[in-house]
Regions:
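Binding-site signature for planar aromatic cofactors or substrates
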Residues: 1-199
Length: 199
């Protein structure tokens, strides 16, 4: 038996947002770690990010990053990007086209930083930015920080590297895999249009 949203566009949209919202709370949700793809025709790549916020009222999702990451330079050159989600159990793939805003040292980052846990802040304490070449295997952290004993006060030094990437959703493509017959739909949020697609 197929789910209620199998042939109902409104229920599909509700299901997508429900999965995004749930991913914020559920660390085990496959939608919590989408692939984020950015760049241009000559230089683009993808990486896993951790979903930190889902805001249907503003068609927005967001994640955190290091200002020194190479994706920040890519986004400053081209704010258009894509995210890919897949849930094997639900048999649902979701593709988002988004426009990105890089927030650094502003009210948005301050609010998010206050909610960022002690251990999560460790990522932003590395001396050199992510992707910097090294002659030896390294975490990038000073020896006194390369453990679980650093203090919350010490973690504050990472704030200068902390960014919040807000992704304004332009369109959503949904694919449901079913033996009876796959279903695919597109939601154009910019123009408030939706239609079925051949899978």
């Amino acid at each position: 038996m197929q789910p209620a949203y199998y042939e109902d566009l409104e229920q599909i949209k509700n299901k997508i947002w429900s999965m995004l919202d749930n991913a914020i709370k559920d660390r085990g949700s496959p939608f919590r770690i989408p692939v984020f793809i950015c760049g241009n025709q000559d230089d683009f790549d993808g990486r896993i990010v951790v979903l930190r916020k889902s805001d249907q009222s503003n068609n927005l999702i967001q994640y955190h990053s290091d200002i020194r990451s190479d994706k920040i330079a890519k986004l400053k050159f081209n704010k258009n990007a894509a995210l890919l989600f897949y849930d094997k159990e639900e048999k649902i793939q979701v593709r988002l086209k988004v426009e990105c805003i890089v927030n650094h040292n502003n009210d948005i980052t301050k609010q998010s930083w206050l909610k960022t846990g002690h251990m999560s802040r460790k990522c932003y304490l590395v001396d050199n930015g992510p992707g910097t070449e090294s002659d030896t295997p390294t975490s990038g952290l000073k020896s006194e920080l390369d453990n679980f004993e650093f203090t919350m006060e010490q973690s504050e030094a990472g704030y200068k590297n902390f960014t919040v990437i807000q992704c304004k959703i332009i369109s959503i493509e949904w694919l449901y895999l079913a033996a009876k017959g796959h279903r695919r739909a597109k939601f154009d949020l910019e123009n408030n249009k939706e239609h079925w697609l051949v899978p």
